[in-house]
Structure formats: structure tokens, C-alpha cells
């Protein structure tokens, strides 16, 4: 009988990752059948999708509340199918709110479970470790320090590296990126990434734009380039930009990035420095070896929730940006909340743009980080999944 694997991915990044893992599984176990919830990358590998990936996609708390009936219906159907015909192993890829609950019920019923992409318990809500311990037979993690964390907690774990490290080149080509974007080869370029969510753009864009205006005042030749994930976010950003004008500001979307490289990556690669919202984009910037200033601002009500939670639980890491977390150091500046004033952002970013010796040092540190994260992620993940399935056979 062929190997059957249940699988749920809830976001495009998870779909891309899962598609590569399925390819790794097929190379090691011909005839393997994977089914559950997934997207086009998984479908291209023969994945049987019971529900489309967007069935799990929500945008903020209001949307999540509205989607509760459909989410519960999807959850119930997937759980029923997997309990009726238990797979050899179930693999949940990210989407922890959905997958950890499902994994717990499947594991109680005797199905081994693997969870890929550990929740950021090291940054927020560490108490989730108890839920993970009960739900997950084996964790697959992206970062080296996570492996030690889960081992300490008695949870079987495999460090498989970060897939971005295998996609982003070890040696970026600034000239090629500028050619793709139509930017002068000798220009000084600042990439501005205020986030991909409406709430992030609303809170960060005014500060980033005011900082950029000050930087252009200092150096009128400076080119500020803003990549946007889609036309909707671009329209939101440009509406704010009309209130905070920056001479020569350029906003680009995917069609202008030319080629398969995400437009944000092209802009990072083309830049001399990056002013970036905390999130995955900070890791992408580090893999492109660019100096950066990391910033983030929460809404007032979210700040109150975070302040309350920080008083209830153990203290967290002193760093917010992923590059600093991974390097265990303030390798690049972080300006958060009230510290994220336009003046402070401008000063820190000016330093990133003009300090050539500092740029060389950070390039060396980010190159070492890139090498540390570079593994054959699909192969390692596939091997671990098959070992869990074999152990349960």
C-alpha cells in the first residue's frame, strides 16, 4: 500500500514550501499520496486539495470573526476525513491556530503528526509550548536556536534550515537588480518597506515618508523606492504619500519588477540600505546583505494587550528583528513604538546609507548568517517526515 500523507498549508509561503517538500517525498517514496488543504504549488505536484488554501486565509480580527462559520466547517470536514481514513502521518505547515488544534486531535487518535515552522514562542506567548508538546510528534524548525529550545522542552525536533537561504543568492547582484528596475547604476538608493498589511502601512508609512523627506533634503540625489505587494496596498500607500511628499519617490509593484524575482527582493538587492517594518522582510534584507533600520509601531489597543501579556508571562528576547534575534545582538538598529520618530528614523537610516565600513561589517555578518541557514530544506524535511511515518508503522 502506498504512503498516504495528510497535509495542510494555509498561506502562499507554506504552499511554496509544501510543494518542494512533496517533491522531496516523491523522490524518496514513489507513489506517495498527499491530500488536505493546499495551493497551486502543491497541486502542481499532484496534491489532492479537499479545500483551497484561501479557505484558511483571514485578514485581521474582524475578518476572522466573520469567517468563523466557514473556518469551523472547513476544520470539521478535514478532521472527519483524516479520522475516517487515517494517513501514515499528518504534516501541518505553519497556520498554527488551525493546525495545532487538528494535530492534537489526530495524535490522540493515533496518527503521528509533524509541524513545520515553529510558532514564534520565543517572541510571544511562550506558554504555547504546552499545546505544541501535546499536539506534535515531531517539529521541523527554520532556525538553529529553535532546535535547542524544543530539545530542552523534550519535543523531538529537526533543524532543516530556512528555504529563503536556498533561493536568495549568496552574492547579490546590485547592478542586475538596478537594470531590472531601471535605476541608475551609480545612484544612492534607499528601499522603503512599510509592511504588507493595511494596518502596518497606515501606522508606519507616515513616519517612513517623513524620514525619507529629511534624507532627500540631506542628499537630493537619493532615490527612494517602495515595493508594494499588490495594487490595493500601493493605492493605500500612495494616498498617504500625497500627504507626506518625498521628491523623486518611486513606488513599484510586481509587474515592474520584471521576471520571477519578487519585486521587494529586486528593490532590496538594488538598494544601498533598507528602512523596513519588522517581519520576514528583515530576514530577506539580511540575506541580501544590506544595512537596514528595523521599525514597528502597534495600534494603541494592541499596545495595551501586549503590555498586559508581557506582565503575565516570562520575559522575552530583547530583540524584535529576525536578523538581530539570529545574531543574538543589535547588529542593526531597531526603532519601535515611541522611539520610531521621523527624526530618529532619518538619523539611523542616514548612518546605514553613508557608513561604508559599517556596511562591509554587516555584509560579512549577514553572509555568515546566510551560510548557517543554508540547508537542503526540502530533502531534510521529507526525510524527517518519512522517518516519523516509518516509526509509526
Swiss-Prot record:
<dbReference type="GO" id="GO:0005543">
    <property type="term" value="F:phospholipid binding"/>
</dbReference>
<dbReference type="GO" id="GO:0009245">
    <property type="term" value="P:lipid A biosynthetic process"/>
</dbReference>
<keyword id="KW-0328">Glycosyltransferase</keyword>
<keyword id="KW-0443">Lipid metabolism</keyword>
<comment type="similarity">
    <text>Belongs to the LpxB family.</text>
</comment>
<dbReference type="InterPro" id="IPR003835">
    <property type="entry name" value="Glyco_trans_19"/>
</dbReference>
<keyword id="KW-0808">Transferase</keyword>
<comment type="function">
    <text>Condensation of UDP-2,3-diacylglucosamine and 2,3-diacylglucosamine-1-phosphate to form lipid A disaccharide, a precursor of lipid A, a phosphorylated glycolipid that anchors the lipopolysaccharide to the outer membrane of the cell.</text>
</comment>
<comment type="pathway">
    <text>Bacterial outer membrane biogenesis; LPS lipid A biosynthesis.</text>
</comment>
<dbReference type="GO" id="GO:0008915">
    <property type="term" value="F:lipid-A-disaccharide synthase activity"/>
</dbReference>
<keyword id="KW-0444">Lipid biosynthesis</keyword>
<keyword id="KW-0441">Lipid A biosynthesis</keyword>
<dbReference type="GO" id="GO:0016020">
    <property type="term" value="C:membrane"/>
</dbReference>
<protein>
    <recommendedName>
        <fullName>Lipid-A-disaccharide synthase</fullName>
        <ecNumber>2.4.1.182</ecNumber>
    </recommendedName>
</protein>
<dbReference type="Pfam" id="PF02684">
    <property type="entry name" value="LpxB"/>
</dbReference>
